[in-house]
Amino acid sequence: FVISGGLLLLPAPPGTPGSDRGRWERSEDDETRCRQALARLAGVLSALALAPPRVLSFPDRENETLALAAAELLGVPCAPFAPSAGPGLVVAYDLARVLPELVATLHHHAPGQLLWAHAARWTREQPVVGDLLSFLYRRNVSPWERHLILDPRRTDLPAGPPAEPPAELATRLMGRPLVPDEADEADEAALLGLARAAAAAPPAGRPALLQADGVRERLWIGSPVPHGPPHRDP
Protein backbone atom coordinates (compact mmCIF):
# COMPACT_ATOMS: atom_id res chain seq x y z
CA PHE A 1 0.00 0.00 0.00
CA VAL A 2 2.84 2.39 0.84
CA ILE A 3 4.31 2.19 -2.66
CA SER A 4 1.29 1.90 -4.95
CA GLY A 5 -1.91 2.43 -2.98
CA GLY A 6 -2.92 -1.13 -3.83
CA LEU A 7 -4.39 -3.45 -1.21
CA LEU A 8 -2.93 -6.94 -0.71
CA LEU A 9 -5.69 -9.46 -0.04
CA LEU A 10 -3.74 -12.62 0.83
CA PRO A 11 -0.26 -12.15 2.29
CA ALA A 12 1.63 -15.41 2.77
CA PRO A 13 1.00 -16.57 6.35
CA PRO A 14 3.96 -16.38 8.74
CA GLY A 15 5.95 -19.58 8.62
CA THR A 16 5.03 -20.38 5.02
CA PRO A 17 8.08 -22.23 3.59
CA GLY A 18 10.10 -19.91 1.41
CA SER A 19 7.93 -16.86 2.09
CA ASP A 20 9.46 -13.41 2.50
CA ARG A 21 7.44 -10.98 4.62
CA GLY A 22 4.07 -11.92 3.18
CA ARG A 23 5.32 -12.80 -0.31
CA TRP A 24 5.51 -16.30 -1.71
CA GLU A 25 8.85 -17.53 -2.98
CA ARG A 26 7.25 -20.55 -4.67
CA SER A 27 3.50 -20.61 -4.97
CA GLU A 28 1.24 -23.42 -6.10
CA ASP A 29 -2.06 -21.60 -6.43
CA ASP A 30 -5.33 -23.51 -6.13
CA GLU A 31 -9.06 -22.93 -6.41
CA THR A 32 -9.44 -22.63 -2.65
CA ARG A 33 -7.03 -19.68 -2.57
CA CYS A 34 -8.86 -18.10 -5.50
CA ARG A 35 -12.16 -18.51 -3.63
CA GLN A 36 -10.67 -16.93 -0.52
CA ALA A 37 -9.34 -14.02 -2.58
CA LEU A 38 -12.78 -13.48 -4.09
CA ALA A 39 -14.33 -13.36 -0.62
CA ARG A 40 -11.82 -10.74 0.51
CA LEU A 41 -12.31 -8.80 -2.71
CA ALA A 42 -16.04 -8.64 -2.02
CA GLY A 43 -15.36 -7.60 1.58
CA VAL A 44 -13.13 -4.70 0.55
CA LEU A 45 -15.61 -3.48 -2.07
CA SER A 46 -18.39 -3.57 0.51
CA ALA A 47 -16.28 -1.81 3.15
CA LEU A 48 -15.53 1.02 0.71
CA ALA A 49 -19.11 1.16 -0.63
CA LEU A 50 -17.94 0.29 -4.14
CA ALA A 51 -20.37 -1.46 -6.47
CA PRO A 52 -18.89 -2.00 -9.94
CA PRO A 53 -21.71 -2.41 -12.48
CA ARG A 54 -20.00 -5.28 -14.28
CA VAL A 55 -16.84 -7.36 -14.47
CA LEU A 56 -14.45 -6.91 -17.40
CA SER A 57 -12.37 -9.89 -18.47
CA PHE A 58 -9.22 -10.32 -20.50
CA PRO A 59 -9.07 -13.31 -22.86
CA ASP A 60 -7.47 -16.58 -21.70
CA ARG A 61 -8.69 -19.38 -19.46
CA GLU A 62 -7.29 -18.07 -16.16
CA ASN A 63 -8.61 -14.54 -16.68
CA GLU A 64 -12.05 -15.62 -17.85
CA THR A 65 -12.47 -18.15 -15.05
CA LEU A 66 -11.70 -15.61 -12.33
CA ALA A 67 -13.78 -12.91 -14.01
CA LEU A 68 -16.83 -15.16 -14.32
CA ALA A 69 -16.47 -16.23 -10.68
CA ALA A 70 -16.22 -12.58 -9.59
CA ALA A 71 -19.29 -11.68 -11.64
CA GLU A 72 -21.25 -14.51 -10.01
CA LEU A 73 -20.18 -13.45 -6.53
CA LEU A 74 -20.99 -9.77 -7.10
CA GLY A 75 -24.21 -10.48 -9.01
CA VAL A 76 -23.24 -8.45 -12.07
CA PRO A 77 -22.68 -9.31 -15.76
CA CYS A 78 -19.30 -10.18 -17.23
CA ALA A 79 -18.07 -8.67 -20.50
CA PRO A 80 -14.80 -8.68 -22.48
CA PHE A 81 -12.37 -5.90 -21.60
CA ALA A 82 -11.79 -3.14 -24.14
CA PRO A 83 -9.82 0.10 -23.72
CA SER A 84 -13.08 2.06 -23.95
CA ALA A 85 -15.04 -0.29 -21.68
CA GLY A 86 -15.77 2.32 -19.01
CA PRO A 87 -16.79 1.56 -15.42
CA GLY A 88 -16.39 -1.96 -14.07
CA LEU A 89 -14.07 -4.31 -12.21
CA VAL A 90 -11.22 -5.33 -14.52
CA VAL A 91 -10.05 -8.84 -13.58
CA ALA A 92 -6.70 -10.38 -14.46
CA TYR A 93 -5.26 -13.59 -13.10
CA ASP A 94 -1.78 -12.13 -13.63
CA LEU A 95 -1.10 -8.91 -15.55
CA ALA A 96 2.24 -10.35 -16.66
CA ARG A 97 0.25 -12.75 -18.86
CA VAL A 98 -1.92 -10.08 -20.46
CA LEU A 99 -0.97 -8.51 -23.80
CA PRO A 100 1.23 -5.48 -23.08
CA GLU A 101 -0.87 -3.25 -25.34
CA LEU A 102 -3.94 -4.00 -23.19
CA VAL A 103 -2.06 -3.45 -19.93
CA ALA A 104 -0.84 -0.09 -21.26
CA THR A 105 -4.44 1.14 -21.49
CA LEU A 106 -4.73 0.73 -17.70
CA HIS A 107 -1.88 3.12 -16.95
CA HIS A 108 -4.36 5.86 -16.07
CA HIS A 109 -7.19 5.55 -13.58
CA ALA A 110 -10.65 5.99 -15.09
CA PRO A 111 -13.83 6.94 -13.21
CA GLY A 112 -15.55 3.85 -11.87
CA GLN A 113 -12.96 1.43 -13.26
CA LEU A 114 -11.19 -0.81 -10.73
CA LEU A 115 -8.35 -3.25 -11.37
CA TRP A 116 -7.92 -6.57 -9.54
CA ALA A 117 -4.80 -8.58 -10.35
CA HIS A 118 -4.93 -11.92 -8.55
CA ALA A 119 -1.22 -12.81 -8.78
CA ALA A 120 1.75 -10.47 -9.16
CA ARG A 121 5.41 -11.36 -9.56
CA TRP A 122 7.29 -9.16 -7.11
CA THR A 123 10.75 -9.87 -8.55
CA ARG A 124 10.10 -8.29 -11.94
CA GLU A 125 9.01 -4.72 -12.58
CA GLN A 126 5.71 -4.33 -14.39
CA PRO A 127 4.17 -1.23 -15.96
CA VAL A 128 1.00 -1.31 -13.86
CA VAL A 129 0.09 -2.58 -10.41
CA GLY A 130 -3.46 -3.62 -9.55
CA ASP A 131 -5.65 -1.57 -7.25
CA LEU A 132 -6.19 -4.91 -5.53
CA LEU A 133 -3.65 -7.75 -5.46
CA SER A 134 -4.41 -11.19 -4.08
CA PHE A 135 -0.82 -12.33 -3.56
CA LEU A 136 2.80 -11.69 -4.51
CA TYR A 137 5.07 -14.45 -5.77
CA ARG A 138 8.47 -15.16 -7.23
CA ARG A 139 7.44 -18.45 -8.88
CA ASN A 140 3.82 -19.45 -9.32
CA VAL A 141 1.74 -22.19 -10.93
CA SER A 142 -1.92 -21.40 -11.54
CA PRO A 143 -4.67 -23.83 -10.44
CA TRP A 144 -5.24 -24.79 -14.07
CA GLU A 145 -1.58 -25.41 -14.94
CA ARG A 146 -0.73 -27.98 -12.29
CA HIS A 147 -0.16 -30.57 -15.02
CA LEU A 148 3.06 -28.66 -15.82
CA ILE A 149 4.62 -29.54 -12.45
CA LEU A 150 7.21 -32.25 -13.04
CA ASP A 151 7.42 -34.33 -9.87
CA PRO A 152 7.07 -38.13 -10.16
CA ARG A 153 6.35 -38.31 -6.42
CA ARG A 154 3.17 -36.27 -6.80
CA THR A 155 0.19 -38.53 -7.44
CA ASP A 156 -2.28 -35.65 -7.07
CA LEU A 157 -1.24 -33.85 -10.26
CA PRO A 158 -3.53 -33.97 -13.31
CA ALA A 159 -2.29 -35.48 -16.55
CA GLY A 160 -3.31 -32.47 -18.62
CA PRO A 161 -5.06 -29.10 -18.55
CA PRO A 162 -8.74 -28.97 -17.55
CA ALA A 163 -11.15 -29.84 -20.31
CA GLU A 164 -13.98 -27.74 -18.89
CA PRO A 165 -14.70 -24.27 -20.32
CA PRO A 166 -14.11 -21.22 -18.09
CA ALA A 167 -17.79 -21.01 -17.10
CA GLU A 168 -17.69 -24.51 -15.61
CA LEU A 169 -14.36 -23.87 -13.93
CA ALA A 170 -15.80 -20.70 -12.38
CA THR A 171 -18.81 -22.59 -11.04
CA ARG A 172 -16.54 -25.23 -9.52
CA LEU A 173 -14.33 -22.54 -8.01
CA MET A 174 -17.30 -20.81 -6.39
CA GLY A 175 -18.33 -24.15 -4.90
CA ARG A 176 -15.11 -24.42 -2.90
CA PRO A 177 -15.92 -24.14 0.81
CA LEU A 178 -14.49 -21.34 2.89
CA VAL A 179 -13.27 -22.56 6.28
CA PRO A 180 -11.47 -19.58 7.84
CA ASP A 181 -9.45 -20.03 11.02
CA GLU A 182 -8.63 -17.40 13.63
CA ALA A 183 -5.56 -16.23 11.72
CA ASP A 184 -7.62 -15.79 8.53
CA GLU A 185 -10.24 -13.78 10.39
CA ALA A 186 -7.57 -11.59 11.98
CA ASP A 187 -5.93 -10.97 8.59
CA GLU A 188 -9.25 -10.04 7.02
CA ALA A 189 -10.13 -7.70 9.89
CA ALA A 190 -6.74 -5.98 9.51
CA LEU A 191 -7.25 -5.66 5.74
CA LEU A 192 -10.69 -4.09 6.11
CA GLY A 193 -9.43 -1.81 8.87
CA LEU A 194 -6.60 -0.59 6.63
CA ALA A 195 -9.01 -0.04 3.73
CA ARG A 196 -11.41 2.03 5.85
CA ALA A 197 -8.64 4.05 7.48
CA ALA A 198 -6.97 4.80 4.16
CA ALA A 199 -10.30 5.79 2.62
CA ALA A 200 -10.62 8.51 5.28
CA ALA A 201 -7.19 9.97 4.43
CA PRO A 202 -6.66 13.06 2.26
CA PRO A 203 -7.24 12.30 -1.45
CA ALA A 204 -3.57 11.71 -2.29
CA GLY A 205 -3.31 9.04 0.42
CA ARG A 206 -6.46 7.12 -0.40
CA PRO A 207 -6.42 3.58 -1.83
CA ALA A 208 -5.94 3.23 -5.56
CA LEU A 209 -9.47 1.81 -5.66
CA LEU A 210 -10.81 5.28 -4.85
CA GLN A 211 -8.77 7.20 -7.42
CA ALA A 212 -10.76 8.42 -10.41
CA ASP A 213 -7.86 10.03 -12.26
CA GLY A 214 -4.08 10.15 -12.30
CA VAL A 215 -1.74 7.29 -13.13
CA ARG A 216 -1.40 3.85 -11.62
CA GLU A 217 1.99 3.09 -10.14
CA ARG A 218 4.36 0.57 -11.63
CA LEU A 219 4.95 -2.69 -9.80
CA TRP A 220 8.42 -2.07 -8.42
CA ILE A 221 10.91 -4.67 -7.28
CA GLY A 222 11.47 -4.67 -3.55
CA SER A 223 9.61 -3.36 -0.52
CA PRO A 224 9.66 -0.45 1.92
CA VAL A 225 10.14 -2.92 4.81
CA PRO A 226 13.55 -4.35 5.77
CA HIS A 227 14.51 -7.62 4.09
CA GLY A 228 17.49 -9.28 2.52
CA PRO A 229 19.16 -8.28 -0.74
CA PRO A 230 16.57 -7.55 -3.46
CA HIS A 231 15.76 -10.36 -5.86
CA ARG A 232 15.60 -9.62 -9.54
CA ASP A 233 14.50 -12.25 -12.00
CA PRO A 234 15.59 -12.06 -15.63
Residue ranges and their predicted role:
Residues F1-P234:
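PRPP-associated nucleotide enzymes
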